[in-house]
């Protein structure tokens, strides 16, 4: 069911809603509805328009500040897109005897052939109780103090508790309720400072129309029928430490074994020194993120280190291959003919030796590397190479006559 909650304004300002009127609409065809509340003063109210689909129920909730036994409203059916009226406006009236009244069904057919069903119910708003919603009780504050507001708006202990401060558990065996009856405290707690509490006793609250001191008398009422309640003691570990469980409506009563107390017998009165210590380590989302970040950083560092270790020797070898070898330091020797026109007997040749080495580009590229120094293939070929001098050559070149 798709529920639409619409607040309809009445002639009186709703300062604090006490009453809720629920209406459920079902149409045989798709149609739009213009809904309007009709008051006794016939003052104008703002209409509300909503769409209905075939066999699709839709719900309205009207909030009122007071309970009125007569509720009047009007309905105008129109086309969904054009807004053209479908027949005349329909006026309906619903009468209430109290908030405990069941749904009131009203089914009719309009002049346009559309069948419309309207079901209406009146209930009290939140924190209002009674047959006409005349009593106020703050259920939220009562729940915080283990109390509840009963059907008449009276402040009583919550189900399963009793005592002046609702701190004592109720033993359902003292009531012996039948037919899903609930054993509760009858004490009415004061809702005002000047009120006094009533006497307390355990009684049975009956359901599904049963009556009697123990809900043993069958008085079936279809409007008060509720679904069978599951056994509250069927829940796993409803009572702890070997306690006996007794259901009491939606609550349980635990009869604790010797040495245990508490609502569920979870508190031990005997203190013993444990022989073992159990340590539970739980990692939060933040700690897991830190560990993952550190692990990724370590893995990334290892990968970078492997690349450096692998490529550093290769780089050194490449640099070694690219180095230019130094040439041999050989003494420079030159021969010079003084008189080329002289006879063979008269020719004079001077040999000049210097200690200054001259390395030109041709010698640089024709010299052999050091590791091939002993190979004659790379030696410089000269006609007559004098042996190197045993002594250091003089600083001034010397001339020898041949």
Swiss-Prot record:
Entry's transmembrane regions: 280-306
MF annotations from Gene Ontology: Notch binding
InterPro entries reported for this sequence: DSL, EGF-like_dom, Lag2
Cleavable signal peptide: 1-15
Tissue specificity annotation: Expressed in the gonad distal tip cell (DTC) of hermaphrodites.
Key words, A-Z: Cell membrane, Developmental protein, Differentiation, Disulfide bond, EGF-like domain, Glycoprotein, Membrane, Notch signaling pathway, Repeat, Signal, Transmembrane, Transmembrane helix
Residues on Cytoplasmic side: 307-402
Gene disruption phenotype: RNAi-mediated knockdown in cells of the pi uterine cell lineage results in impaired basement membrane mobility. RNAi-mediated knockdown, on a lin-15 mutant background, causes adjacent vulval precursor cells (VPCs) to adopt altered cell fate. RNAi-mediated knockdown, when combined with knockdown of apx-1, on a dsl-1 mutant background, causes adjacent vulval precursor cells (VPCs) to adopt altered cell fate; phenotype exacerbated on double mutant lin-15;dsl-1 background.
GO biological process, alphabetically ordered: cell fate specification; gonad development; maintenance of dauer; nematode larval development; Notch signaling pathway; positive regulation of stem cell proliferation; regulation of basement membrane organization; regulation of germ cell proliferation
Gene3D superfamilies from the UniProt entry: 2.10.25.140, Laminin
Cysteine pairs bridged by disulfides in the record: 124-133, 137-149, 157-166, 175-183, 177-204, 206-215, 233-245, 239-254, 256-265
Annotated ranges, domain DSL: 122-166
Annotated membrane topology: Single-pass type I membrane protein
GO cellular component: cell projection membrane; neuronal cell body membrane; plasma membrane
Residue span, EGF-like domain: 171-216, 229-266
Cellular localisation: Cell membrane
Spans within the Extracellular topological domain: 16-279
One Pfam family hit: DSL
Free-text note on domains in this protein's UniProt record: The N-terminal region and DSL domain may be involved in interacting with Notch receptors.
Oligomeric and partner information: May interact with lin-12 / Notch receptor.
Functional summary from the UniProt entry: Probable ligand for lin-12/Notch and glp-1/Notch receptors and involved in the mediation of Notch signaling. Involved in the lin-12/Notch pathway signaling of cell fate in vulval precursor cells (VPCs) and in the postembryonic mesodermal lineage (M lineage), acting redundantly with dsl-1 and apx-1. Functions in uterine cells to promote basement membrane mobility during tissue remodeling. Required for oocyte growth control, acting redundantly with apx-1, perhaps signaling via the glp-1/Notch pathway.
Protein name: Protein lag-2
Organism: Caenorhabditis elegans
């Amino acid at each position: 069911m798709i529920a639409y909650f619409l607040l309809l304004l009445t002639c009186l300002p709703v300062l604090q809603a006490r009453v809720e009127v629920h209406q459920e609409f079902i149409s045989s065809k798709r149609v739009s509805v213009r809904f309007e509340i009709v008051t006794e003063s016939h003052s104008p109210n703002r209409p509300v328009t909503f769409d209905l689909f075939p066999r699709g129920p839709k719900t309205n909730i009207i909030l009122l500040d007071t309970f009125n036994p007569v509720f009047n409203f009007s309905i105008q059916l129109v086309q969904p897109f054009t807004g053209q009226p479908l027949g005349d406006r329909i006026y309906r009236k619903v009468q209430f005897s109290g908030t405990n009244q069941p749904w009131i069904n009203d089914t009719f057919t309009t002049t346009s052939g559309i069948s419309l069903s309207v079901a209406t119910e009146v209930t009290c708003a939140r924190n209002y109780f009674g047959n006409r919603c005349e009593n106020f009780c703050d259920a939220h504050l009562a729940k915080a103090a283990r109390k509840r507001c009963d059907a008449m708006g009276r402040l009583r202990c919550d189900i399963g508790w009793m005592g002046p401060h609702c701190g004592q558990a109720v033993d359902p065996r003292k009531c012996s309720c039948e037919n899903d009856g609930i054993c509760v405290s009858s004490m009415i707690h004061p809702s005002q400072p000047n009120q006094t509490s009533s006497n307390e006793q355990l009684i049975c609250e009956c359901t599904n129309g049963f009556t009697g001191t123990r809900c043993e008398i069958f008085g079936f009422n279809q409007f008060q029928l509720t679904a069978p309640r599951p056994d509250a003691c069927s829940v796993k570990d409803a009572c702890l430490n070997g306690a006996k469980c007794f259901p009491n409506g939606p609550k349980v009563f635990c009869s604790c074994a010797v040495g245990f107390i508490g609502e569920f017998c979870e508190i031990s009165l005997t203190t013993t020194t444990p022989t073992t210590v159990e340590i539970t380590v739980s990692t939060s989302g933040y700690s897991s993120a830190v560990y993952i970040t550190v692990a990724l950083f370590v893995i990334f560092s290892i990968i970078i280190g492997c690349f450096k270790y692998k490529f550093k020797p290769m780089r050194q070898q490449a640099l070694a291959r690219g180095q230019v070898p130094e040439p041999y330091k050989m003494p420079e020797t030159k021969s010079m003919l003084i008189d080329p026109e002289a006879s063979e007997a008269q020719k004079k040749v001077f040999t000049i030796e210097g200690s200054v080495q001259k390395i030109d580009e041709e010698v640089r590229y024709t010299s052999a590397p050091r590791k091939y120094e002993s190979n004659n293939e790379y030696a410089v070929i000269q006609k007559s190479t004098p042996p190197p001098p045993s002594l250091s050559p003089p600083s001034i070149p010397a001339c020898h006559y041949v």
